[in-house]
């Protein structure tokens, strides 16, 4: 019990004293109840001016005595454990169970309320006979803790405290991907509302957009396998209906059964559908990871300023990034009523047509611009040192920028021309890097020349500085000195284009200095892709039908959102951790269950991992002293517990205490996976 006060009276003029008690309901949630109302503080203090302080001290002493008795009881339990029969399980080792997923479950249930969403989907809109929320949350948590295929994840379920997916068959795991695909839009909408509630925002000011490709470890594309997207026929029927209603197709284009018949209009319609690339998903195409030999899928990701996903879109591996951007933005606007925001994107998506498209959707833009494509007048202004504003950090100039107002981005057609603000930047570190890359390219070209390698004209990368005498593919003759010197002169320079949303009230929504700094934020979405690929198992994919592919991507996107939200909370509380540190700390949450008579005890343990990081140059004595000092501070796992609103368990706890720390009600029957119980 503990002492609490509350206001009362007609105008809240009185303070009342009461005894309170904490308890857990049937769902394991912490609740509070009034044990006794002691009365008004002003009356109680008449006989003892320090009444409230003395009362609190009394119950604190009672609490301390309770803790002392618990410690004595714990000591007796440890002594009992040390004397257990060593031959009870024929010398087999005790199982090691993970419980880091309970911290993720806390975010899933209490911060984002995703358990409610999936229970609602199952209750109202699916025929699932299994616990959909249990399977989806388990797959999502495992993407963070130890990403693998669905098949491997199913086999790994017995290594987790609380048996999160006990009794659910493998087929249900794959079926959950079908439900994820079917309800993707409603799930992402709910996810966004929950995220905005956590961040205290109503809409994103800056929206980051980029595209990546993921590969499949299979030799054949969907076209070569004859495997259409699962929803292709439905999408085709929708396109036919729209074409008929708009007059693109007329009655003469159909036979009596409603099938398309050959003809000019029909042929044009089929070509349009083929250009949309909606029939096949896994196709060969451009790959930033140079996996041109494998089928790919294209993923367009939209994130907010905190790096938390807003939505994603999946396209065929051979679809054009330029063409799919319009479809993604249109869908984003319809689903989330996004307007007056600024879309931030890399230069690979910067075209006059896309900029015009964004403006027509009442969106602004902030995109990287190739400095090699600037006109002669603008290039001259870029090299002119006059007008540049220095960017100072820690008393030292690290970069400088210049703003060119009313600059025109030229399109293929006059109608696509867009007036905007051009921001030119120069960075000494970037100059050093660019020059180093050019030298590497130069040596590579000379090496390729000696090998008799052929290149095509207007190639990118190292081949762009290779000299040839033919207009087609030809042998390298040396270094194209003119191109090489032009690239050397551009080293260190970069640019971006900016324009606010057409209907935005504040025409100077982003100050010039903020524009220059925003250039560095373009890497944020690339970081999200790296996290999903390196830490969350986005690729390679081990599913093949289009619905399961999109379900898998949704799982990875939600996992990214959970990690980014957790990282945001850590930064806000002044205890920042990297994504790698968060994952490593979660995986260190391991416990050994031990039977002590009829009671189940849990001994916390973990394997030391890379504890020398950052201390490699210290002597053994210095290292021991530094680690001893660090152990007096909360470790990373303890920080995570505090951030999500849980309490880390002591080194040795019983079943009830373990459940209390993890915010759940653990029972003897459910705490240990069924197949592991015989190991105790």
Residue ranges and their predicted role:
Residues 26, 160-167, 200, 305-308, ...:
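Secondary-structure transition/capping motifs at alpha-helix termini
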Residues 39, 545-566:
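Basic, amphipathic alpha-helical segments enriched in Lys/Arg and hydrophobic/aromatic residues
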Residues 258, 265-266, 294-297, 314, ...:
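An anionic, glycine-rich sequence signature occurring as long contiguous blocks
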């Amino acid at each position: 019990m503990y002492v609490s006060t509350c206001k009362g009276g007609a105008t809240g003029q009185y303070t009342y004293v009461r005894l309170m008690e904490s308890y857990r309901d049937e769902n394991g949630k912490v609740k509070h109840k009034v044990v006794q109302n002691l009365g008004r503080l002003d009356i109680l203090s008449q006989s003892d001016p320090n009444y409230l302080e003395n009362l609190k001290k009394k119950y604190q002493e009672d609490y301390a005595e309770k803790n002392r008795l618990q410690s004595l009881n714990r000591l007796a339990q440890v002594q009992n454990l040390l004397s257990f029969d060593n031959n009870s399980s024929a010398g087999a080792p005790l199982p090691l169970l993970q419980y880091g997923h309970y911290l993720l479950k806390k975010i899933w249930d209490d911060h984002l309320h995703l358990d409610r969403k999936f229970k609602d989907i199952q209750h109202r809109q699916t025929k699932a006979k299994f616990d959909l929320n249990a399977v989806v949350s388990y797959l999502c948590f495992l993407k963070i803790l130890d990403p693998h295929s669905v098949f491997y994840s199913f086999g790994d379920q017995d290594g987790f405290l609380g048996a999160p997916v006990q009794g659910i068959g493998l087929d249900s795991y794959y079926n959950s991907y079908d439900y994820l695909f079917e309800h993707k839009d409603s799930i992402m909408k709910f996810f966004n509302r929950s995220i905005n509630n956590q961040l205290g925002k109503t809409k994103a000011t800056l929206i980051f957009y980029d595209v990546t490709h993921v590969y499949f470890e299979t030799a054949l594309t969907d076209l070569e396998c004859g495997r259409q997207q699962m929803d292709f026929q439905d999408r085709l029927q929708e396109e036919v209906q729209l074409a008929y209603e708009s007059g693109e197709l007329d009655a003469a284009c159909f036979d009596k059964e409603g099938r398309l018949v050959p003809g000019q209009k029909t042929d044009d319609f089929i070509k349009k559908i083929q250009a949309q690339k909606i029939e096949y998903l896994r196709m060969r195409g451009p790959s930033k990871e140079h996996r041109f030999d494998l089928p790919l899928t294209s993923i367009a990701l939209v994130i907010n300023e905190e790096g938390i996903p807003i939505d994603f879109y999946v396209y065929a591996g051979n679809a054009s990034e330029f063409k799919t951007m319009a479809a993604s933005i249109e869908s984003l606007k319809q689903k989330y009523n996004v307007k007056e925001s600024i879309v931030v994107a890399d230069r690979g998506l910067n075209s006059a047509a896309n900029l015009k498209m964004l403006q027509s959707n009442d969106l602004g833009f902030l995109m990287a611009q190739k400095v090699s494509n600037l006109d002669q007048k603008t290039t001259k202004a870029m090299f002119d040192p006059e007008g540049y504003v220095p960017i100072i950090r820690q008393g030292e100039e690290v970069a400088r920028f210049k703003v060119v107002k009313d600059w025109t981005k030229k399109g293929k057609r006059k109608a696509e021309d867009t007036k905007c603000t051009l921001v030119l930047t120069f960075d000494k570190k970037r100059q050093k890097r660019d020059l180093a890359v050019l030298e590497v390219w130069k040596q590579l070209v000379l090496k390729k020349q000696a090998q008799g390698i052929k290149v095509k004209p207007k190639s990118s990368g190292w081949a762009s500085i290779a000299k040839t005498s033919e207009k087609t593919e030809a042998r390298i003759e040396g270094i194209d000195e003119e191109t090489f010197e032009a690239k050397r002169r551009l080293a260190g320079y970069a640019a971006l284009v900016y324009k606010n949303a057409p209907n935005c009230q504040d025409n100077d929504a982003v100050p010039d200095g903020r524009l220059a700094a925003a250039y560095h934020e373009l890497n944020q979405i690339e970081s999200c892709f790296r996290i999903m690929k390196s830490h969350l198992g986005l690729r390679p994919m081990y599913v093949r039908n289009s619905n399961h592919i999109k379900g898998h991507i949704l799982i990875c996107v939600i996992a990214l959102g959970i990690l980014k939200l957790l990282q945001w909370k850590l930064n806000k509380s002044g205890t920042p951790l990297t994504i790698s540190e968060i994952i490593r700390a979660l995986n260190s949450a391991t416990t050994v269950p031990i039977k002590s008579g009829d009671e189940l005890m849990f001994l916390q343990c973990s394997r030391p991992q890379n504890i020398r990081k950052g201390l490699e140059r210290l002597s053994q004595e210095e290292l021991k002293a530094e680690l001893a000092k660090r152990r007096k501070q909360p470790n990373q796992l303890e920080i995570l517990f505090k951030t999500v609103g849980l309490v880390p368990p002591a080194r040795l706890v019983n079943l009830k205490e373990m459940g209390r720390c993890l915010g759940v009600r653990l029972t003897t029957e459910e705490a240990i996976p069924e197949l592991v119980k015989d190991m105790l």
